[in-house]
Curated annotation (Swiss-Prot):
HAMAP family: TatB
Physiological role: Part of the twin-arginine translocation (Tat) system that transports large folded proteins containing a characteristic twin-arginine motif in their signal peptide across membranes. Together with TatC, TatB is part of a receptor directly interacting with Tat signal peptides. TatB may form an oligomeric binding site that transiently accommodates folded Tat precursor proteins before their translocation.
InterPro entries, per the entry: TatB (IPR018448)
Name of this protein: Sec-independent protein translocase protein TatB
Ranges for region Disordered: 147-188
Quaternary structure and partners: The Tat system comprises two distinct complexes: a TatABC complex, containing multiple copies of TatA, TatB and TatC subunits, and a separate TatA complex, containing only TatA subunits. Substrates initially bind to the TatABC complex, which probably triggers association of the separate TatA complex to form the active translocon.
Keywords: Cell inner membrane, Cell membrane, Membrane, Protein transport, Translocation, Transmembrane, Transmembrane helix, Transport
């Protein structure tokens, strides 16, 4: 405690014997021993109180961390997790039900061509050189966005799929007329 070796204790004992004397030396040593006992007792009490305060502080920290863990696990209880999972499943089922309740989608295939549309397509192709897409008026009105015309629609506008009488219309031949009225027109 004081870091005193044997040689230093012998020096202190010799000085005490010379200074105090041999008669009073045992009484002085007894008194020094009592003071040392009191000092040790005070030191042990202080040490005990200090350790008790440290334990209380550790217990308070442990209790605080335990309460934090308890609060965190309160939100993760299995009943709460099952309730949350059940609500998510019911939401998913409601989404699927709304998809099933919606009206069926009408097909987007064009209506079958009529002879008028073939004549119109043939005329358009002859004038512009591009095939005309044949669609019904209801489909044209229902289209909200401009989409590229699929190749199948172009195929309907070709003359290969047209009825035989409209695919190759007969050439327009002038009807035979009498040459007499034409001659009369030249003469006048």
């Amino acid at each position: 405690m004081f870091d005193i070796g044997w040689s230093e204790l012998v020096v202190i004992g010799v000085v005490a014997l010379v200074a105090i004397g041999p008669k009073e030396l045992p009484g002085v040593l007894r008194m020094v021993g009592q003071w040392m006992g009191k000092a040790r007792k005070l030191a042990s009490e202080f040490q005990g109180q200090f350790q008790e305060a440290m334990r209380e502080a550790e217990m308070a920290d442990l209790k605080k961390s335990f309460d934090e863990v308890k609060e965190a696990t309160a939100g993760l209880s299995t009943n709460n997790m099952l309730t949350k999972l059940g609500s998510e499943l019911s939401e998913a089922a409601a989404i699927d039900k709304s998809a099933l309740d919606s009206p069926p989608v009408e097909p987007t295939t064009p209506a079958p061509p009529t002879p008028e549309t073939f004549i119109e397509a043939t005329t358009h192709q002859a004038v512009t050189g591009e095939p005309l897409a044949i669609v019904s008026e209801a489909q044209a009105a229902g289209a909200h966005t401009t989409l590229p015309v699929p190749a199948e629609t172009h195929a309907l506008a070709t003359t290969d799929l047209a009825p035989p009488d409209l695919a190759h219309p007969a050439p327009a031949h002038p009807e035979p007329t009498n040459s007499e009225p034409a001659k009369d027109a030249k003469a006048s």
